[in-house]
Amino acid sequence: MSKQLLVDVRPFEISRQQIDESIKENNGRLVVKGVLQRAAAKNQNGRIYPREVLVREAKKYEDVNVRERRALGELDHPESSVVNLNNASHNVLEMHWDNDDLLGTVEVLSTPAGNILKELFRSGIKLGISSRGLGSVEPVNEADGEDGTVEVQDDFELIAFDFVSNPSTHGAFMRPVNESV
C-alpha cells in the first residue's frame, strides 16, 4: 500500500488566566503542555496508531528535531509533508510518555502565525494539536463488523505537530506552563 499524508488531531483548552500566567512566568513567551498523541486507541479519524510505531517515531522526532530546537509546527495543516517556515507557529520543547499518551511542552513563537495562535488562545478559541506524518494504513476487522477502522502501519514517519481547528483525537488539552522553562 502506498504512503499517504496522515493527520490526527487532539483538542487543547487554555483559560485566559492560564495564558497570562504562562506569559508572565516565561519571560513573555506562551508555553503550553498536554497530550500530543495517543497510542493503541481509535481516534475520531478512525485510525489506531500501534504503540511501538509511535514510540519509535517519537524517539526519532525527539532525537532529530526536539533536541536541535527545530521541532517546528504550523498553524493549520498544509497539504505538504514539509514544514513551511513562513507558517511556523510553535516549537516542541520536550516530549515524554505517560502510559499510552505522548505528552509534550510547546512554545508558541513570536512569528506571524505564532502571534495568531497566541491571540486565538487568548480569545478562548478551542484548538487541537495534530500529528502530521506519512504512512500507510490497513483495515482492522472489528468484532461488530466493518466500521472503517484502520491501523497505521510500520512505515509511518512523524513529520510535525500542527495546531488546527478541528480535533480528531480525544483528550489532548494543552495548558499553559506557569514555571520557567
What are these regions (language model features)?
Residues 62-83, 129:
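Short conserved beta-strand and strand-loop elements enriched in small hydrophobics
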Residues 56-59, 77-80, 104, 145-147:
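Short secondary-structure boundary micro-motifs
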